[in-house]
Amino acid sequence: MMAQQGHRRLLVLSGDADWARQQAIHLSEQLPGDWLWVGDNFPPGANGIRPTAAKTLLGQEGLHGVFDATDGLNTEALAVLAGVLRAGSWLLLLVPAWDDWALLPDSDSLRWSEQSAPISTPNFIHHMQRQLLASPDVFLWQQGQLPPVPQFAARPNWQPPDGTPTTEQQAILQRLMQGRQGVWVLTAARGRGKSTLAGMLVAQSAGHCWVTGPGKAATQVLSQRAGDRARFWAPDALLEYCQQHDVSDVDWLLVDEAAAIPTALLSALLAYFPRALLTTTVQGYEGTGRGFLLKFCATLSDWHHITLTEPIRWASHDPLEQIIDDIMLFDDDRINDKLSPTGSATASIGITVCEQSNWLSNSELLRHFYGLLSSAHYRTTPLDLRRLMDAPGMHFSAAKVADSVVGALWLVDEGGLASALAHAVWAGQRRPKGSLVAQSLAAHSGQWQAPILLSRRISRVAVAPLWRQQGIARQMIAAEQARAQGEGLDFLSVSFGYTVELACFWHACGFHLVRIGSHKEASSGCYAAMAVLPLSRAGDMLCEAARQQLVRDWYWLQQWIGLETPVSLFPPEQPDITLNDDDWRELAGFAFALRPLEASLPALQRLLLQDKALQIKAPLPALRQYLQQGRTTAEIVHQLGLSGRKALVTKWRQEAAEAMAELKPVGNFLVNINNFQ
């Protein structure tokens, strides 16, 4: 019946883990199929895979599946498995006893809660239970009760695809074949035939077509359609090849699940090919396709958006797809599209503080808030929904016009570490979970006291597209600033991919730039920047110390990262090459502790410019070759006869200690180096 209707359904088995698994085994023996089993514990001989490896299933298909959530619920893995199952499939979801489930520790919370032990996740579990019970197409079998008897409503028989393009696919293929240059971005929900269409394009194209994506396994469906005409490349390997060879004879580059590839890498690849087809999922395990359109595609000069709406792997109104969408809020990133700013000059915009307890009592608020975040940040995934609903230390504000959410702000508590632990973070010896900015200021900017202070980091901020450029984000931030100050916090912070536009925005909000990383972020292709808004005297002192350190060090940092000087820094024209107290502390941390070279780079550069006698007494070949002569680590390792990079780092530290001893008696060091051994 289900196969005839083209539908898939969910059966929830709730009870003890052993009972649930035994029922799943029994049912799998009664129904022939592939029976993909996702969980940390699966029966011997099962076609099983752990939740953390579920992405390897992408691009594949199977009949029937089991998802074991008795110990923890990995929502991304559940979404992946649901997308893999074809028409006629049952998905068996194994969960703890129904009434106990929300109270039990969830092992998956270790991935996103920033806690040292699993926590219970009552808000998300109650939300999920509510969706499961509300669906007439979900069957619940609880231990100690009789199994449900599935009742299927009469529906017309489904006509599965016969291998030829659907009307929708054919129209898109014709459009693609007529194109001479540009980038086409194909978005669709799972099961709509994106990969199949890409394979058809390869099969019909007269020229060479190359394929790339986050993993070769994910292109299985595409390859089946394209045969041996599609050559697969890993993204980084393809870029390296393009940089060294002529690829002008390649007509098409096909990028599967493009939103999963770092934007800088994707941009670099597109420059080498006249035509490119990028496919990405509208909503799912990797994030949102709509956000991908807003963020990445807006940077392209010649791109075209195309979409597939009709499913081909199952029939329309599929029960399994609908319940997964309801649980993950996959359909809620469009809910703000109809909000018009007409009359906004007189519209009353209210800033509302939201707590996690509000999400269950006001499901519409949750849908609007999370939907807005999903549409604005294309790497928003189901993991973020789990964190938003149950992770400790989360704070939220919503900008509302009447009952509509037009702005969303998400903040995370940071700091409060013990002094000894903060020193260990500074020394490079410890890196506990959480406190992203606070720990980074200690580990990379020398501000060891940052993790001790109480702070709150802005994690996400989003404003509905039609309501932007009206100061709504600044209103929300100002409200949270007052709230945090009233609670006795020391500072607010933010981490962002550095662009002039974003730097100016945060500066206008009162934040001061205090750190710029030495490497570009994979997600944004920009250097990671951090800014602080002080709220207390201690926060003022930290902010000023970190800002002045960045200004003083900028001469050497800029040579390392090649970034234009931020307008808010105003560094001196000539670098300060004297060694001050902060430099000696930094050098001691590098020489006698485990601070990374990148964090100590300006102090090391100053060290190398000291007394000329130092060059005779301590030539420091490893440091000089790397910092002054621009040699690669591989070249230095070979030149000095070292065993590898680890030995080179040890050599760097030894040379730093040697130079310090020559310039300043060890007994007079400002830092007791014994603390760092």
Curated annotation (Swiss-Prot):
InterPro entries given in the database record: Acyl_CoA_acyltransferase (IPR016181), GNAT_dom (IPR000182), NAT10/TcmA_helicase (IPR007807), P-loop_NTPase (IPR027417), TmcA/NAT10/Kre33 (IPR032672), TmcA_C_sf (IPR038321), TmcA_tRNA_bind (IPR033442), tRNA_acetyltr_TmcA (IPR024914)
Keywords noted in UniProt: Acyltransferase, ATP-binding, Cytoplasm, Nucleotide-binding, RNA-binding, Transferase, tRNA processing, tRNA-binding
Location in the cell: Cytoplasm
Domain spans labelled N-acetyltransferase: 351-533
Pfam families for the chain: GNAT_acetyltr_2 (PF13718), NAT10_TcmA_helicase (PF05127), tRNA_bind_3 (PF17176)
UniProt record, GO biological process: rRNA acetylation involved in maturation of SSU-rRNA; tRNA acetylation; tRNA wobble cytosine modification
Broad EC category: transferase
Keyword rRNA-binding: no
Positions contributing to ATP binding: 169, 191-200, 313
Catalytic reaction equation(s): cytidine(34) in elongator tRNA(Met) + acetyl-CoA + ATP + H2O = N(4)-acetylcytidine(34) in elongator tRNA(Met) + ADP + phosphate + CoA + H(+)
Entry binding sites for acetyl-CoA: 461-463, 501
E.C. designation(s): 2.3.1.193
UniProt record similarity statement: Belongs to the RNA cytidine acetyltransferase family. TmcA subfamily.
Function, in words: Catalyzes the formation of N(4)-acetylcytidine (ac(4)C) at the wobble position of tRNA(Met), by using acetyl-CoA as an acetyl donor and ATP (or GTP).
Name by which UniProt lists this protein: tRNA(Met) cytidine acetyltransferase TmcA
Record organism: Yersinia enterocolitica serotype O:8 / biotype 1B (strain NCTC 13174 / 8081)
Gene behind the chain: tmcA
